Amino acid sequence: MPTKSTFSRWKKADLIDLANKLEIDGFPNYAKKSDMIDYLESHLNHLEKPVDFKDDYPELRSFYESMTVDQSKDERNEYGSGSGNGSGSGSCDTATNDSDLEKAYIKEDDDEKPQSGDETSATKPLSSRNANSNAKTNFNLLDFSTDNDSSTSAFTKFKFNFQEYLSDIRYQTQKLNENVQDYLSTISAVDTIFSLLEFSFLVRNILAAGQPTSSSSLASSLEAAVAAHNKYQYTLDFCLPILTWLLFFRGIPTLVSYYINFIRYDLNIELDPMTFNLTKFLISLAIFKTCNNKNIDFHSFRCVNQLWTQLCTVNRSLGMVPLVFSMVSCLLTLYVL
């Protein structure tokens, strides 16, 4: 593996695109850049055969070229060490003589080293030694570099890597945009938008119907004051139509579509959108037709009359809106599926 990776100059977004192109499973998209590079190089090194970097993956040409250079260096080092071992094992007598000579030379060098050190220390001028001691105590001359090469210091290596943060923000924004587009292009998202519109129309009309009259007569003012003090009845008048709408326009279609999908044993989706919208369409049509029929009377049944009153309130507030929305959803479901 090369000492300095060829991917070090790449951006994180480019590394993620390359991983998607190589179809790498479990690639750490939210990890550090160094971890991404290690994971990518480990995957490329453990492949059975190199990828086609001439036609399919031209961006990997520099990576494989650097691998070839490193392998040639390793082979050269192994060849040099092997040739040295072979020449050393040619003859026992020659090896013994060479070792004796090496020991003698080493001993002579050890004897000469203290003398040379003393001579250099003696010949070193006093001013230079004072300058070195002053440099150690002068904090303005401190050197924080840890490398042997004086041209590269720790200050040149430090950087904030703002481009990586900017690339992360751009990648996250692009990912969020794609997720929003994928969600809004589904039938369930369309049904959710239609339901929110129906709910807003219902709440607006209920609140408009519950406002007191603007008449200035004394009787109307007293009635408005009594109605204002009757908080319990006002809460019921506001909550019961909403609960009725949730039951008939959301609850029953959801239950029917879930049951039909459960019978079909389709694990890809939880609710059948066609069954949901068709059930909602039939319920909306039945409520709209029945509420507009003046000949039906449910006053003899108190519970049915209360439920029917709430259904008529919902029908007066929404009109044909649920009917139209469910029909549009059915057509969209047929178009998509």
Curated annotation (Swiss-Prot):
Biased composition (Polar residues): 117-132
Modified residue annotations for Phosphoserine: 66, 72, 99, 116
Region (Disordered): 66-95, 107-132
Superkingdom of this protein's organism: Eukaryota
Protein name (record): Glutathione transferase 3
Name of the gene: GTT3
Protein's cellular compartments: Nucleus membrane
Membrane-crossing segments per the record: 240-260, 314-336
GO CC terms, sorted: membrane; nuclear membrane; nuclear periphery
Entry keyword set: Membrane, Nucleus, Phosphoprotein, Transmembrane, Transmembrane helix
Membrane topology classification: Multi-pass membrane protein
Organism of origin: Saccharomyces cerevisiae (strain ATCC 204508 / S288c)
Organism classification: Eukaryota, Fungi, Dikarya, Ascomycota, Saccharomycotina
Chief location: nucleus
Extra remark: Present with 1300 molecules/cell in log phase SD medium.
Keyword Nucleus applies: yes
Residue intervals on the Cytoplasmic side: 1-239, 337
Perinuclear space side: 261-313
